[in-house]
UniProtKB/Swiss-Prot annotation:
Induction: Not induced by Pi deficiency.
Protein's name according to its UniProt entry: Phosphate transporter PHO1 homolog 5
Keyword presence, rRNA-binding: no
Topology Cytoplasmic: residue spans: 1-420, 481-505, 564-694, 761-823
GO biological process: phosphate ion transport
Keyword entries, A-Z: Cell membrane, Membrane, Phosphate transport, Transmembrane, Transmembrane helix, Transport
Entry's transmembrane regions: 421-441, 460-480, 506-526, 543-563, 695-715, 740-760
Record family assignment: Belongs to the SYG1 (TC 2.A.94) family.
Provenance organism: Arabidopsis thaliana (Mouse-ear cress)
Domain EXS intervals: 627-823
Tissue-by-tissue expression: Expressed in root tips, vascular cylinders of roots and filaments, leaf petioles, stem, receptacle, stigma apex and anther connective tissue.
Membrane topology field: Multi-pass membrane protein
Amino acid sequence: MKFGKEFSSQMVPEWHEAYMDYDYLKSQLKEIIKFKRKTNPHGPHHHHHHLLHRKMTLHRAFSGLISTSPKKKKHHGHGGGHGGGHQIGHFSDSDDDIEEGIKHVTAPILINSASHGYETTFLMASEEGGEYETVFFRRLDDEFNKVEKFYKEKVEEVMKEAVMLEKQMDALIAFRVKVEHPDGWPWEERTVEMTQLASDVANSAAAVAASTPAGARSMKVGAQAHMEAIQEGGSSKAGKSSDEEDDDDAEKEEDNGVSGEVSGDVRKMKAGRPPPIEVLDRVKFNHTKETPRSTIKSVLQASNLTELKFSRENLRKVEAKLRRAFVEFYQKLRLLKSYSFLNELAFSKILKKYDKITSRHASKSYMKMIDNSYLGSSDEVTRLVERVEATFIKHFSNANRSKGMNILRPKAKRERHRITFSTGFLGGCLFSLVVALFAIIRTRNILQEEGQKQYMNTMFPLYSLFGFVVLHILMYAGNIYYWRRYRVNYSFIFGFKHGTELGYRQVLFVGLSIGVFALLCILANLDMEVDPETKDYQALTELLPLFLLTGMFVVLVLPFNIFYRSSRFFFLTCLFHCLAAPLYKVTLPDFLVGDQLTSQVQALRSIQFYICHYGWGDYKHRINTCTESDAYNAFLFIVAVIPYVSRLLQCLRRLFEEKNPEQGYNGLKYFLTIVAVCLRTTYSVDEDNQFIWRILAGIFSAIAAIFCTYWDLVYDWGLLNRTSKNPWLRDKLLVPQKKVYFIAMILNILLRFAWLQTVLDFNFSFMHRQTMVAVVASLEIIRRGIWNFFRLENEHLNNVGKYRAFKTVPLPFNYDEDDDKGN
């Protein structure tokens, strides 16, 4: 794999724009190549010269594996940073060149540090084609300054978060001791232990403010010495030296004229640190879990903070929250380390390409500047990683390093060959069963039998439920495949725990399994019905779909850790939040599940038919009076509007919390849909006034469909932007083929108006009415599958625009800030 593709594949998707634009810099190098080819038609000869030079270097005498290192050359000072205009260096490659037997070559660039970033001066701009190389270094500087600025901002953010975690750890240790030793405990033995994390955070925060390369290097040396002095559970002497080092860091910052906001907060916190037991007097429980009770409290404007209750149950909850916070924080640190490493590697690669193309020796000079910059020399993130690991292992994994590291660094989920094989096998079985079903219907002439209409009115709605479920699962599997292909971070958007998200193969496995079992039941039903020997067992024949539905429900709610338990519980949680919409804070997974339910209205009506057919009908003889029951017809309205009412309540909740008028318009969309669904249902039930209901249903359905289509394209997908650089689309597109978006918009419009069948009564002589209903419902599911892809693509691009790559993790304790300031 070429480096460019590997570089893109290793990026944090939400930070894509903050990385070095490798492809753009390559295009600048291609401009240099084009110019050289125009002005130097004997370019191949130049290439052979390099090959000859390469062969000559291979024929040099071997210098040995164990040799005395040459005397180090004293380099020029590289001091200076963003605070002033200093010359970073005019380096040369003399050391390496002498070793390789190459004549001394002076570097063609001069790098300066200004207040707004690093600037490179190309010293050979007067040469032919020098303007192209000048532009290249100008763009290179822009990319590096962008990368370093972003990295510095993110490091400052994690340092602030480290301060908060340190406070939480103080409270946790105090709370733990209070629970385990209610009669008192010698705190003096733990004072140093509790301040170690704060000491490192203070030193690291001070290093963030040191923007000069020289300052960063000096702090790096001090940090290494400090890390050697600190041991987990060290002596009071070690703690004292930590405080003294913090004071030294503060003096360095004052001398440099740099105000370290984060480190200042840490020093102030540590200077006014009360005795550890007094920490508990300043904190309360922060109830961040959304419940109906907390919702009612927020409406009544009551505080969600409660006094501390020292029990082992509360201790377990606090530890669980802090454990999750540390894991999330650790992932941030790892991504920051990866960001720094990948960008340094990318700059090294692009500079080597430049040297190869131009036969100059600029890479070493520029890379030395990078190594001495904040991006290359700061080690704050590395030190925090070490401290977080030590803290987590000691306090959250009982000093078991392997256990703690397995939690902090969960292993990547391996694709199992048996899943791939099973999915392919089930796909083949499904295809074979479909062929067998059509063959049985054809050979036994079932469509012309006397009970064909009765079968379609009773058994077909029962089995069509499984078809709707399987189709929706297959569409979701397709969504996952294309989300991964176009690097949509769906697991982050949905909030899946790392390692628990299902891949498209697992989802296909689930869908195909349900499809195979459903087809087996259908074939068994038809076979037993036709076979004279089993025709008498009417109860068993008719109960097959009920058995399958019951089995699916049991597997869905099974509490054991089998059949993808985390995914099943995630779905059930979102489903419950949809049913209790106004009482729970609306999250993206919750309203996405609600949107899926709006496309499964016919499946919900099939479940209603199950209850009526097996509860009050004579299922043995396929006789029921469901359509003649007033209660059943009333529930046709209720069941059909439940998903839309749920989404309407979610929109109202968000309107109340966020004060965003868009949520009000979104709620109006669902209200119009509720009216249209009720009118269409009334039209299909009330045969006495069908003409009036038909007109009303057509008018409101048209209004709702137009409103919903506009909302889909403009707000959910972010398309139809006339001023975009991609006309009528949006500025950022993940799918390179623009025609895909136009095709999707056309399909969404056509499939959105599939309701016309229910109003205009399209009938085909070869298709039963129940078959037509199933086809229309399937088209809506397909439309929803298409909608899902572009909806999450737009959400992902919104995260990219805000560089939002992490979830906010709620913390268990809430500090009284007034007390903090008072102390």
